[in-house]
Amino acid sequence: MSIMKPTTRFFRFNSLELAVSPFQRIYGQLRFLRKQPKPFLVKLLNNEVSKLGRQGDVVSVTRGYYRNTLFPKKQAIAVDALKSMKAHLLQGSEFSTKTKE
């Protein structure tokens, strides 16, 4: 019984011959399919959080920390939601000034 070696294929790249095994080819394709790290989210703190900041500070936190710790305890709010609330309040104040005149 003979031991079979993985076959290799030769490719020319910049006039160099490179031997690529099927395992290397599959690993190279899987490398791009791995999950990328999730970006940090910017949050506004509702009250003081130890090691993070004081009330009113805008901080960057990971999605998991916000979802599992800050959001259930109502210690932080998303900045995007805050911007939309400010816009809504500004529209309401413009409406109230128009009705008073």
From Swiss-Prot:
It comes from the Eukaryota. GO terms for cellular component: mitochondrial large ribosomal subunit; mitochondrion. Residues 1-32 form a transit peptide. It is found in: Mitochondrion. Keywords: Mitochondrion, Ribonucleoprotein, Ribosomal protein, Transit peptide. Coiled coil: none annotated. Signal peptide: none annotated. Gene3D superfamilies: Ribosomal protein L9, N-terminal domain. InterPro entries: Ribosomal_bL9/RNase_H1_N, Ribosomal_bL9_N, Ribosomal_bL9_N_sf. Its main location: mitochondrion. GO terms for molecular function: structural constituent of ribosome. Pfam families: Ribosomal_L9_N. One of its GO terms (biological process) is mitochondrial translation. Component of the mitochondrial large ribosomal subunit (mt-LSU). Mature yeast 74S mitochondrial ribosomes consist of a small (37S) and a large (54S) subunit. The 37S small subunit contains a 15S ribosomal RNA (15S mt-rRNA) and at least 32 different proteins. The 54S large subunit contains a 21S rRNA (21S mt-rRNA) and at least 45 different proteins. Belongs to the bacterial ribosomal protein bL9 family. Component of the mitochondrial ribosome (mitoribosome), a dedicated translation machinery responsible for the synthesis of mitochondrial genome-encoded proteins, including at least some of the essential transmembrane subunits of the mitochondrial respiratory chain. The mitoribosomes are attached to the mitochondrial inner membrane and translation products are cotranslationally integrated into the membrane. This is Large ribosomal subunit protein bL9m. It comes from Schizosaccharomyces pombe (strain 972 / ATCC 24843).
